[in-house]
């Protein structure tokens, strides 16, 4: 293609990057003119985008941000307004908020206000970096105006390019966390390799005690993109043509700079996922510089703006030796927090310690097909050491804690290879001492530079996965504790907490942060609109009816999943009333992801990308099955006692478990039903709108009873793609993993990863099935379309939901 971007040291943001911030400089000096001439010598020719921003260009840009078609400015502002409190919660107290490039500070002040509300004005410190003294003066004035609580001493300005400015910021604040804010999707003006080089330089300039908040415009449909850069009023065209006028004046041919001499052309480049803004010469322009002519019909690249997919963002982080610690996004825009892999590892350990600090007895084994809690504290350290220091010496405890267990649910004597289980696990203090020493060794390896980015990602994602599965154990511990307390107490409510709000809030935060919305654009929390819980039903937890997210109340047996109130399923039972069935048209999907191990990280079962395959049309419920609906099957209709709904192998496991309801439920003799989450229990009536979490075997039994089935992995991908923009299928990727009926198997061309070959291969056994999406307890770094989680179909503890699927009639 072409080399269109100036060097990082003179990098200037452009309109394609939503110029919230400007590295504006007076471009008529010798070095800048040299960059201009260098661009004109290329083929095709390009103009450095800094020439777009003379006084007139800046005025035109301000007009652009107010246009209805130009969504980036508003989308970013909306995102910051929506998630300011959540973003600030990820900023440690005492940090320095550093902004690269200073503009009006209108969006920056949103975060400053949230920081002030949390820490108080005296504890908030802002540092702006820009090459323009004029921009710095304006930014300082605006920050003081919009955040009058801040004292002048709390606002610093550094006149330098980005990297030099970060060096000065670090010199002024040698021990503080630098929270670097890069607004406006300015990274979109850089080619992929340039962006990687820039972020590597950022880490060198600011040091490891740095976190970056990077805003990126997301790739979207061509019509929306074209309208944003070719508005109906012609303002963007005037802006681009003014840039050409400015550039030609700089090289002394201003007499030939008439805007009428140029045609404006916007190209949406789907291969490189970018918008390209070109000018086409209507006539020859002779002697531009160094015997360079512009010929009639020749195309000059004025600006480009890359748009990003989540894969692009992960790849940028990986190649720059950063880790995506958290993400906030809406349908159009995304903000992610990058931290170094070393910092990410330490933050992960803090989360691990916080979880285990809340476990009173590490010897408890609330899930009998898993080890006791204490094992996993040692296991996470052992695994991290073995993967980040693969050539290091291994101790006895390294080996003992190296791998957990996942025995066959039908026959627990069958299990993959794992270390022998000792007669007695080490005591808690011994495990803590082991973990502390291992972590010190790992930090030393990070400091020496011997830990590869890939090995760090393996350790990080493994630990985050385990923190979620530990939540499954905590939910079972809560259930057992609840049942023990209620057995010893006449007044159950005095012995347990019934608050389900924190689970709602966690789910709502995750779903808001990852752009999920219902058809009206409202955030949806497990089927409850805007976090409002609707509790209908009798006082003992039985459910006579339920209220949907639209506020309309229905009796649970008034209508049916197939939408025909007069029909019955083939088994003679009345199907349940549900949300509408969505018709998903036939189409092609592509499973898997192509990832060069040196450029991005994915687990082996995510790879390689498959050839497109056709998926026939099908119908799918617009939302997952709720607790209310599952109560009808499990309790009212005694579905667990009806053999005709269950496969023979599942029925055998069910009888062995002797539990006639989901694993997270308690059904008491007096009819009260409770749902358990880590650290809390709730009356079913208070959470009946939430999706029920069950095993695949339980999901399939329900679907058999209701006259449907569980979707396949291919159908999941087709539904996710079909509803990418219209949100007709709610809560598909959030609110609980989504069961598929697809056995976990290698994709064609699969190659086991050399660092951890047994990660997938041990479970290509016909007993494990694919789950997709995420739960409220899934870390942001694991939420990607290509991620394939897997569990045995009879395993009842996973936080996984399901929905009715049907063939098109």
PLM segments and residue spans:
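Class I SAM-dependent methyltransferase Rossmann-like catalytic core
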Residues: 46-88
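Surface-exposed recognition segments
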Residues: 606-611, 636-660, 733-809
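Substrate-binding/catalytic lobe of Class I Rossmann-like enzymes that use SAM or dcSAM, i.e.
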Residues: 218, 224-306, 314-320
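Conserved beta-strand signature within the Rossmann-like core of class I S-adenosyl-L-methionine
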Residues: 205-219
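Short, contiguous alpha-helical
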Residues: 361-410, 447-499, 618, 632, ...
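A short glycine-rich, aromatic-capped structural motif
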Residues: 376, 385, 573-701
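Disulfide-stabilized, aromatic/cysteine-rich ligand-recognition loop
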Residues: 341-371, 378-379, 390-395, 399, ...
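Conserved hydrophobic ligand-interaction patch in extracellular adhesion modules
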Residues: 584, 620, 641, 691-692, ...
